[in-house]
C-alpha cells in the first residue's frame, strides 16, 4: 500500500495547532448551502466500498460514509475522479481522514435520502480511531436543511497527524519560541479559521486560539475567575464574553435608567452587571453582545435570585470609576451551562427562574397586541414546548421577542430557554419570560441530539400531558363532596387546593350560564346597558357589540352531599360541548334548544377537577369551589381507586 505524503503546503492549509481537527457541523452547513459551502471540510471515513453504477445521469464508482464528528452522512465518489479512486481505494476505509474539496448534493431519486456526490478530495491521514466527543453523540443526518438550521457547533474533535509529525513538531517549537526580532505570525489565525466559514466580527471572541500564542500582557495580569468574585475582594478584575445584553429600561417614578448585562468567562461562570443613569447610557453604547471585555471596579452585592439566574451568589453594580476594556480573544470559548428542569417537574419551581431544554411544538403565526387591565398596550406570542417528560407547556414571549421571532427558527427545533419562570394559574402551569430570559437556538450542549431523537422516534407514541391545564387529576384518588366540606379543604392555601370528585349535575340555571362581556381583546368585564349601547366600566368606553362569555353555576351531587360550583371559559365549554359564542347564538335564536342542552347535562356521572378555596363575604368565611376540568368516568381506574381506599380504611381499623 502506497504511503501518504504530506507536503508543507497541505500541512499549512489543513492543520490546526499542528493537529487534524474535524470540521464539526460541516455536513449541516453543506446541506443548508445545497452543496460545497465555499470552504473545504475535514471529515472522517467510517466505511467505504466499491459500487459502480449510474443514477439520474451521474456515474459513480465508490460509496463511503463520512462523519464530521457531529453528523454522519452518505456520499458517492463521482466517476470523474475514477483514476484517483483506483490509486487510493485501499486508503478509503474506516478511520481515514480526508478533506472534501469539491462536491454537490446528489438526489438519489424518489424515496431515497440525498447524499454528497464527491468530485474532489484529499487524503490527509490514516489509521485513526473513530473520532467523537463526549459532549455530543454523533447522529445520522436526515438530509433536511431545516432540521438543524443554523447549528454550528464549537466542539473541538481532533487528533495527532502522524504523516506530518515532523512539520507539527516544528510548528509547536516555533509557536513556543517565536523569533525575538519578528512579530508573531498570523498564519495560525488563518489556519484555525479554515475549518469553518469566517465568523462575523461580533462573534470573534468565541474563537479558540492556541494557549502557546498568548503572553501575559499588563491587561491580563491580576484577572480572577468570575466564580471568585465576592464582596470581600476589594479590587477584582475579570475577563469574559458578554453573553447577554438587555435593553435600557427607564422607571418613570424616579426617572431612573437601568442597564443590565451578563459576562461569562472561559470556565463557564457568569455574573450579572448593572449600571444606572449616565453610566448605563454610556455602557449601553459601548458593550456589544458576544465580544469579550476586561472589567474591574464596582460594588459587589448579593444577587437577587428572583431576577438573576446566572447561578452566581453575587452581582456587580458598575460605577463611573469602573474600567471596561476590550478583551480580545478568550483562551477558551465560554461554556453554556444549563441547570435544566424537565417540563414535567416545573410545578415544584413556581415563581423561580429556571432553565429548560425543549422542542418547540408549535407557536402563534403572529404576535398579538392587546390592552392590559392597567390600560397598557402589550404584545405577546405563545408557543407550546415539549421534552422527554412528555409534558406540553405554554410559554409566552413579550414585546420585541414576540415580534421578531420567526416560526421557522423555532418550530420543531431544540431551544434552550435560560431564566424562564413557571407560573401557576387555575391549577395549571405555564412558563413566562422576562428581562433575564435568554433564548439559545440549537445549543451546543449535551442532550440536544438525544432530545431530537426522542422527538422524532418516541414522542409520536407518547401520551402527552398538558401542564397548562389543571394538573394532578388523572392519578389522584377521588374525594367526596362531604369530605371536602367537612375538612374545609383549601383553607391552608391562599390560592386554594385541588381535588377530584365523582359527581353529577343535579341542578343548573340556564338563565345565568352566559353573560355579555366586553369585546376588547383581553377584557372579560360584564357590560352594562346604556342608551341602547353597552358600556365597559373597566375600559371606560361605550360599544355597540359584545362577546358571550361563560359564568356557569350549577349543583354537583354525589352519594355524600351537594355543593354549588362555578365554571368559566374553556372548562364550561367542555361541560356544555359548545363555545360561549355558539351557545349565545342559540340563546338568542332558539331558546328551546338552548334549555334542552342544560337538561341533557344533568344526572350524568363525571370526574370533576375542582379548586377549593376559602373566601370571605360579608364577614362570613365560606368555601368556594370552581371547576377546572371534567372528564368521563374511567370505570376501571375508579374501581381500582375504591379498592385502594378500602384497603387503607381496613389498615386503619386494624390499627
From Swiss-Prot:
Output compositional bias ranges, type Low complexity.
Answer: 196-207
Which keywords describe this protein according to UniProt?
DNA replication, DNA-binding, Metal-binding, Nucleus, Zinc, Zinc-finger
Q: Where is this region: Disordered?
A: 195-217
Q: Which InterPro entries match?
A: Euk_RPA1_DBD_C, NA-bd_OB-fold, Rep_factor-A_C, REPA_OB_2, Rfa1
- The organism's place on the tree of life at top rank: Eukaryota
Task: Give a GO cellular-component term.
Answer: nucleus
Tell me the Gene3D superfamilies matching this sequence.
Nucleic acid-binding proteins
Subunit note: Component of the heterotrimeric canonical replication protein A complex (RPA).
What is the protein's given name? Answer: Probable replication factor A 73 kDa subunit
Q: Which organism is it from?
A: Caenorhabditis elegans
The top of its lineage is:
Eukaryota, Metazoa, Ecdysozoa, Nematoda, Chromadorea
Amino acid at each position: 500500500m502506497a504511503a501518504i505524503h504530506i507536503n508543507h503546503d497541505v500541512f499549512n492549509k489543513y492543520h490546526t495547532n499542528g493537529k487534524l481537527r474535524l470540521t464539526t457541523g460541516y455536513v449541516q452547513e453543506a446541506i443548508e448551502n445545497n452543496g460545497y459551502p465555499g470552504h473545504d471540510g475535514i471529515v472522517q471515513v467510517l466505511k467505504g466500498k466499491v459500487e459502480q453504477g449510474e443514477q439520474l445521469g451521474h456515474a459513480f464508482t465508490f460509496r463511503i460514509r463520512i462523519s464530521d464528528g457531529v453528523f454522519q452522512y452518505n456520499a458517492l465518489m463521482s466517476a470523474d475522479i475514477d483514476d484517483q479512486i483506483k490509486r487510493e481505494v485501499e486508503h478509503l476505509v474506516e478511520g481515514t481522514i480526508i478533506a472534501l474539496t469539491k462536491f454537490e448534493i446528489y438526489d438519489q431519486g424518489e424515496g431515497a435520502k440525498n447524499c454528497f456526490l464527491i468530485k474532489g478530495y484529499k487524503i490527509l491521514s490514516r489509521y485513526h480511531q473513530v473520532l467523537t466527543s463526549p459532549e455530543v453523540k454523533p447522529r445520522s443526518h436526515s438530509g433536511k436543511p431545516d432540521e438543524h438550521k443554523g447549528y454550528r457547533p464549537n466542539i473541538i474533535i481532533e487528533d495527532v497527524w502522524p504523516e506530518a509529525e515532523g512539520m507539527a513538531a516544528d510548528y509547536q517549537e516555533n509557536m513556543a519560541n517565536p523569533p525575538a526580532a519578528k512579530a508573531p505570525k498570523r498564519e495560525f489565525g488563518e489556519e484555525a479559521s479554515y475549518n469553518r466559514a469566517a465568523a462575523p466580527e461580533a462573534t470573534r471572541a468565541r474563537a479558540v486560539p492556541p494557549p502557546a500564542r498568548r503572553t501575559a500582557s499588563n491587561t491580563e495580569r491580576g484577572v480572577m475567575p468570575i466564580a471568585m468574585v465576592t464582596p470581600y475582594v476589594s479590587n477584582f478584575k475579570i475577563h469574559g464574553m458578554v453573553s447577554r445584553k438587555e435593553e435600557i429600561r427607564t422607571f418613570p417614578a424616579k426617572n431612573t435608567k437601568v442597564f443590565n448585562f451578563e459576562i461569562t468567562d472561559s470556565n463557564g461562570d457568569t455574573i450579572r452587571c448593572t449600571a444606572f443613569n449616565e453610566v448605563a447610557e454610556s455602557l449601553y453604547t459601548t458593550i456589544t453582545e458576544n465580544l469579550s471585555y476586561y472589567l474591574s471596579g464596582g460594588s459587589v452585592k448579593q444577587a437577587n435570585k428572583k431576577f438573576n439566574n446566572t447561578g452566581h451568589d453575587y452581582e456587580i453594580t458598575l460605577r463611573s470609576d469602573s474600567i471596561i476594556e476590550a478583551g480580545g480573544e478568550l483562551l477558551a470559548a465560554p461554556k453554556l451551562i444549563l441547570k435544566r428542569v424537565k417540563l414535567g417537574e416545573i410545578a415544584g419551581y413556581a415563581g423561580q427562574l429556571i432553565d429548560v431544554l425543549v422542542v418547540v411544538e408549535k407557536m402563534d403565526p403572529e404576535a398579538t397586541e392587546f390592552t392590559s387591565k392597567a390600560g397598557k398596550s402589550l404584545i405577546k406570542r405563545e408557543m407550546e414546548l415539549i421534552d422527554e417528560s412528555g409534558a406540553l407547556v405554554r410559554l409566552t414571549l413579550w414585546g420585541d421577542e414576540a415580534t421578531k421571532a420567526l416560526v421557522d427558527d423555532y418550530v420543531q427545533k431544540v431551544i434552550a430557554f435560560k431564566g424562564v419562570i413557571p407560573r401557576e394559574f387555575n391549577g395549571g402551569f405555564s412558563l413566562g419570560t422576562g428581562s433575564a430570559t435568554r433564548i439559545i437556538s440549537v445549543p451546543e450542549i449535551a442532550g440536544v441530539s438525544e432530545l431530537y431523537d426522542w422527538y422524532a422516534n418516541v414522542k409520536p407514541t407518547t401520551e402527552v400531558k398538558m401542564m397548562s391545564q389543571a394538573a394532578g387529576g388523572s392519578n389522584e384518588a377521588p374525594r367526596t363532596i362531604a369530605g371536602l366540606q367537612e375538612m374545609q379543604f383549601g383553607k391552608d392555601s391562599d390560592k386554594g387546593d385541588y381535588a377530584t370528585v365523582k359527581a353529577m349535575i343535579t341542578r343548573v340555571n340556564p338563565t345565568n350560564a352566559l353573560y355579555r362581556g366586553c369585546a376588547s381583546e383581553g377584557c372579560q368585564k360584564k357590560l352594562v346597558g346604556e342608551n341602547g349601547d353597552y358600556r365597559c366600566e373597566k375600559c371606560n368606553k361605550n360599544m355597540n357589540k359584545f362577546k358571550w362569555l361563560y359564568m356557569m353555576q350549577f349543583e354537583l351531587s354525589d352519594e355524600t352531599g351537594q355543593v354549588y360550583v362555578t365554571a368559566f371559559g374553556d372548562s364550561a365549554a367542555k361541560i356544555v360541548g359548545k363555545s360561549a359564542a355558539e351557545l349565545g347564538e342559540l340563546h338568542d335564536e332558539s331558546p328551546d334548544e338552548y334549555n334542552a342542552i342544560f337538561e341533557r347535562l344533568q344526572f350524568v356521572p363525571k370526574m370533576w377537577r375542582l379548586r377549593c378555596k376559602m373566601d370571605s363575604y360579608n364577614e362570613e368565611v365560606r368555601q368556594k369551589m370552581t371547576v377546572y376540568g371534567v372528564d368521563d368516568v374511567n370505570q376501571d381506574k375508579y374501581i381500582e381507586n375504591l379498592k385502594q381506599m378500602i384497603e387503607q380504611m381496613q389498615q386503619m381499623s386494624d390499627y
